[in-house]
A protein has these predicted regions:
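Acidic, proline/glycine-enriched N-terminal capping motif
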Residues: 1-137
Length: 137
């Protein structure tokens, strides 16, 4: 997905009379809709997976323009890793919410997770596969 990976935003709250409602902020909603659309295109006419799944997320983050040429080179060759925000767990939350009901029915189906966050051209790669069930004794 050609997006700059971002984390799941905090839930927002609005008061309407005596009621307080919770909603997702517009930037997070738009980001998740972009991922959801890409997931729908990738799935085609296939139904969502119903059993346990493995989720692989590869988030390539842009190098900040404020970095020197030396530091930018270090980021791109992998000697400096992306340890800034967004946190990798928040990236995963957005991905799982966007894929829910399209790729898999519910995010509780994810039983194996592998995520990587690096510097490079910004994009997000998502792979979901059915888990191979193993019998251990």
């Amino acid at each position: 997905v050609d997006v700059i990976p971002r984390g799941k935003g905090r839930a927002r709250h609005a008061r309407r009379g005596n009621f307080i409602s919770t909603y997702t902020d517009s930037k997070t909603r738009s980001y998740e809709e972009t991922i959801n659309l890409a997931a729908k295109q990738a799935m085609g006419a296939s139904d969502p997976l119903e059993g346990p799944v493995d989720l692989f997320v590869y988030a390539s983050m842009p190098v900040p323009q404020s970095y020197s040429k030396t530091r930018s080179k270090a980021c791109l060759d992998g000697s400096e890793r992306h340890t800034k925000k967004p946190d990798i767990d928040n990236i995963i939350k957005s991905v799982m919410d966007a894929c829910q009901k399209v790729v898999f029915l519910n995010d509780t189906q994810v039983v194996n997770l592998h995520a990587t966050k690096v510097y490079g051209e910004p994009y997000l790669e998502i792979m979901v596969r059915e888990t191979e069930c193993l019998t251990l004794r």
